[in-house]
């Protein structure tokens, strides 16, 4: 029998070498899980298959792990390392013989109990052939090639058709000491071990492939049979005086417009195309904090990805990154503007479902869409949508649109069993493809519709776009959020009717803000946005190379030692390496003279660079405010710095979606300034190091906030110098003054006089009770007056004089 087994293993290994290409996750399992190849090692898998064993053996050899085909010495015993929970069924019949897994588990546990040895590694390994979720009603191809437990004959077809898409995921070794320490019947422990493994593999399969897919016809029929849509069809027939059949047909048309038509084959094709595209466009894609998603899937959570929206490239980048992490691509809420030929069909088969900008006046559409979204959650599909609603044209986060999040919570009120978690995602680029279009739109040009010609133009202009960045933020469990903030939320659960309790709106708005905060917590610094921070505050947007490198080193050390959040990622390269990389992107001019090199932003890029600076300006808000104060005062105290930050931080927090202020943050910033020899700290007293280099560094850092503080001064100035001003007048006059100030002082940043930004700031002042409604209009509080005096001390005299002259002239 041993000879037969040996021959079969050799044969399967040969076939594996010819036909199988395995993708392994994590990429370095030995480092990720601190695996020790010298420790006793076992691999527990779902299926006892020779092809699975052969594929695993090749991967283990590549990563320096013990061979799963060999036996492991454990005490006086020799045990098979490969533990398969289930045997494949025979060629004829459905009942498979039981495996030796239970006996193997018992032998391992008996050894642990008798010897006390704690270094035994039992590693769960998920092995999948292809990532197709399967059909609820299998077709011929499914019967031949796809089965969780195929016979050896069907397994040949599986390897033949899906061998190039073999997927192997190692998981954290099972903590057997916890299992052994439990006060349970010793005889039950092996069964519990296998039960834990089965649950794990079921969740891993669901995370990698998603639930089984119904046919489009099945999906539509189930949706049309729901009580909610039935009632909406009846209402449609009455309202439009048409027959039930016509109203039903209208609902079918809407479903065809909305519903995704997910195809794993399309995903595979797209994955290969996107791999080629990224290599053409980018020098690499940096992806961070993926382990959080795997923790959620291991716990059986449904996931909602909520990224910021910089570019149409986001759709591709995030889906690609998720797929490469061994997770099923989410169903993506895409604007109806993207449903054009042929892109619409490609997006739809890649998991996109389409949403109109407004549901207003169309009750049938609203009912159909909400029911479709509810079914996605009920069936267990992951979903992705952009909480900003559209792409940011300025580089800063847009105020969240809460419609999709509200519908998500309403779906939860249908009584979904599984927990649902939101994963905020920060996306950043060193070059945004649409940046020139954004600038034109901010200048007042009409937004152009999407078309296939735009895509061809983008592809034609393929060039070096630097690096892309994708950071997964801290997850938010919606269930836990509601438990904490709305403890009685389960009282409103109804299995069929769409619920809209009074608490829904406020809780959705608050949750949306938390998502935005966590997106900004996970921001990514890169060469372009850091250089934008430095060069945009300098005359002519240029700086000598030595000073530029010194300032870049200052910022890198500041962000590494006194980071706003532990999720912020900073480049690991040296300033010199970052500058060399940035110069290859054709965004900078290098001017040489007898004194050395000067680095300047290319003329055509100067206004565009405000976009990249806005991506990370929030990370420098507090350091910049402190630096500006230090530069102006030269001598101050820690207490005054804390008071200044306390005055402005609520305004910053609303504008940039910042988390609650951590007092330790100010301490860490000042400590970093001390370490970089910018200040001297003597108890509460701070003295600036009075050297030219020190002054220049603090001046450049402080200037990063200039435009923001000038906007504040414009709005607050009108309020403080009037006896009351109407909101509409305040908005209008503030925009006019901002435009005038821009002309006087050469400010070309589009959002400086963007009405939306000014209106948002005024709304924030009201929300924080810094302004209130009086008989004559808006009036300021005492606290606002104090903020106004702080602004007067911080802003340059010539700028303050320009603001003061115009404000006082207008308010006479």
Curated annotation (Swiss-Prot):
Major site of localization recorded for this protein: membrane
Motif segment (HXXXXD motif): 308-313
Compartments it resides in: Cell inner membrane
BP-aspect Gene Ontology terms: CDP-diacylglycerol biosynthetic process; fatty acid metabolic process
Entry GO terms, CC: plasma membrane
UniProt keyword Cell membrane present: yes
Family annotation (Pfam families): Acyltransferase (PF01553), GPAT_C (PF19277)
Biological or metabolic pathway of the protein: Phospholipid metabolism; CDP-diacylglycerol biosynthesis; CDP-diacylglycerol from sn-glycerol 3-phosphate: step 1/3
Enzyme class: transferase
Reactions catalysed according to its record: sn-glycerol 3-phosphate + an acyl-CoA = a 1-acyl-sn-glycero-3-phosphate + CoA
The keyword Cell inner membrane is annotated on this UniProt entry: yes
Top-rank taxon, per record: Bacteria
Topological category with respect to the lipid bilayer: Peripheral membrane protein
EC number: 2.3.1.15
GO molecular function, one term: glycerol-3-phosphate O-acyltransferase activity
Coiled-coil parts of chain: none
Keywords: Acyltransferase, Cell inner membrane, Cell membrane, Lipid biosynthesis, Lipid metabolism, Membrane, Phospholipid biosynthesis, Phospholipid metabolism, Transferase
Domain remark in the UniProt entry: The HXXXXD motif is essential for acyltransferase activity and may constitute the binding site for the phosphate moiety of the glycerol-3-phosphate.
Family membership noted in the UniProt record: Belongs to the GPAT/DAPAT family.
Stated name of the protein: Glycerol-3-phosphate acyltransferase
Organism of this sequence: Pseudoalteromonas translucida (strain TAC 125)
């Amino acid at each position: 029998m041993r000879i037969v087994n040996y021959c079969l293993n050799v044969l399967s290994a040969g076939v594996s070498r010819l036909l199988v290409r395995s993708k392994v996750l994590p990429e370095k399992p030995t480092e990720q899980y601190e695996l020790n190849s010298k420790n006793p090692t076992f691999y527990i898998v779902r299926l006892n298959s020779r092809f699975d064993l052969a594929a695993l053996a090749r991967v283990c050899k590549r990563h320096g792990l013990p061979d799963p085909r060999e036996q492991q010495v454990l005490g006086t015993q020799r045990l098979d390392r490969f533990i398969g929970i289930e045997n494949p069924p025979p060629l004829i019949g459905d009942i498979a013989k039981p495996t030796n897994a239970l006996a193997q588990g018992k032998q391992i546990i008996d050894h642990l109990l008798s010897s006390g040895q704690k270094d035994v590694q039992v590693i769960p390994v998920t092995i999948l052939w292809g990532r197709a979720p399967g059909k609820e009603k299998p077709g011929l191809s499914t019967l031949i090639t796809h089965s969780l437990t195929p016979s050896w004959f069907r397994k040949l077809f599986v390897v033949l058709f899906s061998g190039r898409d073999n997927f192997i995921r190692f998981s954290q070794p099972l903590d057997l000491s916890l299992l052994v320490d439990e006060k349970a019947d010793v005889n039950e422990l092996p069964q519990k071990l296998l039960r834990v493994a089965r649950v794990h593999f079921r969740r891993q399969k669901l995370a990698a492939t998603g639930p089984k897919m119904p046919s489009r016809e099945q999906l539509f029929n189930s949706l049309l049979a729901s009580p909610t849509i039935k009632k909406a069809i009846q209402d449609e027939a009455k309202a439009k005086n048409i027959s039930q059949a016509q109203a039903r047909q209208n609902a079918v048309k809407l479903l065809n417009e909305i519903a995704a038509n997910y195809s794993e084959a399309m995903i595979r094709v797209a994955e290969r195309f996107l791999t080629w595209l990224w290599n053409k466009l980018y020098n690499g894609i940096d992806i961070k904090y993926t382990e959080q998603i795997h923790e959620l899937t291991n716990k059986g959570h449904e996931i909602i990805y909520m990224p910021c929206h910089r570019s149409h490239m986001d759709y591709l980048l995030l889906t690609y990154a998720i797929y490469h992490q061994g997770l099923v691509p989410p169903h993506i809420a895409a604007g109806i503007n993207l449903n054009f030929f042929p892109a619409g069909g490609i997006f739809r088969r890649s998991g996109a479902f389409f949403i109109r900008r407004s549901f207003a006046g169309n009750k049938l559409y609203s009912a159909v869409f909400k029911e479709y979204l509810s079914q996605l959650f009920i069936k267990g599909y992951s979903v992705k949508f952009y909480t900003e609603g559209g792409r940011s044209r300025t580089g800063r986060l847009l105020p969240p649109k809460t419609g999709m999040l509200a519908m998500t919570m309403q779906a939860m009120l249908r009584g979904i069993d599984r927990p649902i978690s939101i994963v905020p995602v920060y996306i950043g680029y060193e070059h945004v493809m649409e940046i020139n279009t954004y600038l034109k739109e901010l200048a007042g040009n009409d937004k152009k519709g999407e078309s296939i010609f735009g895509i061809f133009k983008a592809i034609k202009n393929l060039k070096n776009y630097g690096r892309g960045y994708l950071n997964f933020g801290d997850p938010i469990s919606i269930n836990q959020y509601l438990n904490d903030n709305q403890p009685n939320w389960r009282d409103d659960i109804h299995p069929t009717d769409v619920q809209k309790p009074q608490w829904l709106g406020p809780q959705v708005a608050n949750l949306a803000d938390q998502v935005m905060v966590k997106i900004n917590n996970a921001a990514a610094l890169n060469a372009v946005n850091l250089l934008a921070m430095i060069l945009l505050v300098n005359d002519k947007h240029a700086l000598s190379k030595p000073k530029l490198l010194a300032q870049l080193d200052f910022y890198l050390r500041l962000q590494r030692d006194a980071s706003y959040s532990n999720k912020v990622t900073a480049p690991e390269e040296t300033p010199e390496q970052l500058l060399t990389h940035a110069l290859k992107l054709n965004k900078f001019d290098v001017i040489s003279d007898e004194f050395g090199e000067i680095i300047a932003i290319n003329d055509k890029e100067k206004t565009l660079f405000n976009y990249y600076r806005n991506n990370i300006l929030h990370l420098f808000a507090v350091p910049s405010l402190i630096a500006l104060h230090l530069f102006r005062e030269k001598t101050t105290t820690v207490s005054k710095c804390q008071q200044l930050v306390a005055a402005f931080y609520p305004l910053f927090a609303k504008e940039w979606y910042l988390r609650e202020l951590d007092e330790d943050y100010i301490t860490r910033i000042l400590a970093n300034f001390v370490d970089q020899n910018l200040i001297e700290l003597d108890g509460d007293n701070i003295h600036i190091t009075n050297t030219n280099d020190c002054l220049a560094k603090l001046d450049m850092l402080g200037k990063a906030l200039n435009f923001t503080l000038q906007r504040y001064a414009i709005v607050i100035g009108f309020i403080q110098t009037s006896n009351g001003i109407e909101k509409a007048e305040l908005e209008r006059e503030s925009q006019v003054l901002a435009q005038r100030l821009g002309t006087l002082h050469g400010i070309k940043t589009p959002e400086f006089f963007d009405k939306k930004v000014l209106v948002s700031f005024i709304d924030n002042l009201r929300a924080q009770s810094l302004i209130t409604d009086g008989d004559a209009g808006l009036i300021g509080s005492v606290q606002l007056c104090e903020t106004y005096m702080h602004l007067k001390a911080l802003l340059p005299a010539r700028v303050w004089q320009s603001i003061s002259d115009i404000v006082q002239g207008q308010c006479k």
